[in-house]
Amino acid sequence: MTKKYDPDAVIIMGSDDIITKEIINFYVEKINSGHLLVGMKDFYIYESYLKKLAHWRGYGKLNDAHRMDETIGLGRCLARPLLDKIEFDVWGGLELRRNLDGAMTNRLKEVGIFPVSEKNCPVVGYGGKILRVGHVGYKLNEMNGFAIDIKSKTNVTSFDRYLNRDPESVTFKEGGILEEYIYKDTIEKIMTLDGQE
């Protein structure tokens, strides 16, 4: 479906995800410099039922060592050459309700796109262009941006799952940080969700 719009790149977003324009601008710069896949390594989570806000620092050594350089699923940005290579099918034809991020990472590995740091990202010449062939992630502070996943009672990945896997990876925050990045009317709508979608 997305292919009909002839995009230069696609950002993977859920209906309960918000990212700021700073992240989009950062992605545009990276895609224009030849990166095939960029994304975030950390994000904020708001649990609407419990009214709790937290920062998740990303995959860590404790329970996710095998995913250390992998980006989170929210906000992954895939460039057109990569989309063409995978025929615009990020999940490889699988009908999934869970583990979407890991399934996408595995699909990308099938075509040679592995999680790497920017400094270790392979660079190749292709069709007269320089391409950076890796799954490269950045921290929100490197992008001067903000990303949040609004959790309800029905989310695929619950708030508690982050806490249970690695309690040290979650830092609870005061709600004031939202006001730095999100419009007031949007914050008000988020606060009234009360666990509903």
Model-derived segments and spans:
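Short, conserved alpha-helix that lines the donor NDP-sugar binding/gating region
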Residues: M1-K3, T105
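A structural signal for short, well-ordered beta-strand segments and their strand-loop junctions
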Residues: I12, L37-M40, V116-E118, K139
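C-terminal catalytic/acceptor-binding lobe
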Residues: L94-E197
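Short beta-strand-to-loop acidic/aromatic patch adjacent to the donor-nucleotide binding site
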Residues: P7-I18
